[in-house]
């Protein structure tokens, strides 16, 4: 297992909520806003500011089938990107996911 794979897998395993994002991405900002508004403790990684960000993004594609950001995990479960996350929010399903966090 590469160091990037170990980093991503550890981040997902060690945190209830993990978001792999990019600092300039409006969809990432929308996800981060909901998390902040709900006062959820989340680990957010701005991969465009990390030296190995491209490698992380490539591994996320391999792991999840999704290359785009944000790439969101709740309780080690991949929930998708911002559109998936916002759909869960609109349906009122985020609270139950977060409450198990």
From Swiss-Prot:
It comes from the Eukaryota. GO terms for biological process: cellular response to oxidative stress. It holds the Pfam family Glutaredoxin. Residues 5-101 form the Glutaredoxin domain. The keyword Amino-acid biosynthesis does not apply. The disulfide bond functions as an electron carrier in the glutathione-dependent synthesis of deoxyribonucleotides by the enzyme ribonucleotide reductase. In addition, it is also involved in reducing some disulfides in a coupled system with glutathione reductase. Thioltransferase catalyzes cellular thiol-disulfide transhydrogenation reactions. It transfers reducing equivalents to cytosolic protein and nonprotein disulfides. PANTHER family: GLUTAREDOXIN 2, GLUTAREDOXIN-1-RELATED. This is Glutaredoxin-1. It comes from Schizosaccharomyces pombe (strain 972 / ATCC 24843) (Fission yeast).
């Amino acid at each position: 297992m590469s160091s990037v794979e170990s980093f991503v897998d550890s981040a997902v395993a060690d945190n209830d909520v993990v978001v792999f994002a990019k600092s300039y991405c409006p969809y990432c900002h929308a996800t981060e806003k909901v998390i902040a508004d709900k006062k959820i403790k989340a680990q957010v990684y701005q991969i465009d500011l990390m030296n190995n960000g491209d490698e992380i993004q490539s591994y996320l594609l391999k792991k999840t089938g999704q290359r785009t950001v944000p790439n969101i995990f709740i309780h080690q479960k991949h929930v998708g990107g911002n559109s998936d996350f916002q759909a869960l929010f609109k349906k009122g399903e985020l609270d139950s996911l977060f409450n198990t966090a």
